[in-house]
Amino acid sequence: VIMTFYGTITFNQQISFMRLISVNLNGIRSADSKGFFPWLKAQEADVVCLQETRIQPEQLTDVMLEPEGLKSAFEFAVKRGYSGVGLYFKKKPDRIQRGIGWAEMDTEGRFIQADFGKLSIVSLYLPSGSSGDVRQNFKYKVLEYFEKWLLEAKKSGRELIICGDWNIAHKEIDLKNWKNNRKNSGFLPEERAWLTKLYTDYGYVDVFRELNPNPDQYTWWSNRGRAWEKNVGWRLDYQVATPGIAAKASAESIYTAERFSDHAPLIIDYDCRL
């Protein structure tokens, strides 16, 4: 935040970046009870992309609707206590789009987009297929539909950042126990190849990986065993962007000092102003 005193003295002039946070909350009420909102206030983020809010409009509290310094927009699942995405933002967007335009996906509350000038920011929650064949087949349908959407979005010429829980670990480096998970949803060859296609054929960029090539960088840990304690995790949360805005990314972090969810917040700073 740039503060001006009597219109002449400016403090914090060095702050000229955009901070973008993506976090799967595994229930916004649960995250609230674990201290998420005091932490969020301290981040001074420009935009926050939420997934798996698991809430209905009438259940939103004042702090959920307007955390200090932020406004909000939400997209809800029809089914109560399930899925749902949202956005927090300092600057009012020019436009908000709730849903991607395909009923099968939109009834589950998996997509919301905010446009700021020539930049679009999406909060995305791709389905998990881990419960069985029915959901895995639905996941493939969503990937097929979303791929077409991504292709059209690229053609539009707009800059785009898609933040969210993609429910896919791309490469062996992106999960601890990759050998034992090659036949499991989230690390299936078809899912991984789909992500590769987005990067190599369509030119989208995995922003975190451009900044941090190191192993053991995870954003989700199973609640079974001592996965969190031992850092036996998966990198399922991404900020995927068009090349122009991706090139402006300057710093990344995965916040693990506190635990608000089974996912950790993914924070990336971009050398631009919203």
Q: What is each stretch, according to the model?
A:
Residues M18-N26, K118-S130, C163:
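Active-site-proximal beta-strand elements of phosphoester/diester hydrolases
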Residues K90, A114-G117, T242, I268-C272:
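Active-site beta-strand termini and strand-to-loop segments that position acidic
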Residues I2-P67, A77, Y82-V85, L198, ...:
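N-terminal, active-site-proximal structural segment of metallo-dependent hydrolase catalytic domains
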Residues V23-N24, L40-E58, I121, W149-E172, ...:
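Active-site beta-strand/loop signature of hydrolases that rely on acidic residues for catalysis
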Residues R80-I96, P215, G225-A247:
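Conserved beta strand-loop-helix elements of the APE1-like EEP
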Residues T53-R54, L60-G129:
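Structured beta-strand-rich core segments of catalytic domains in phosphoester-bond hydrolases
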Residues I100-W102, L126-L143, N180-N184:
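Surface-exposed cleft-lining segments at the edges of enzyme active sites
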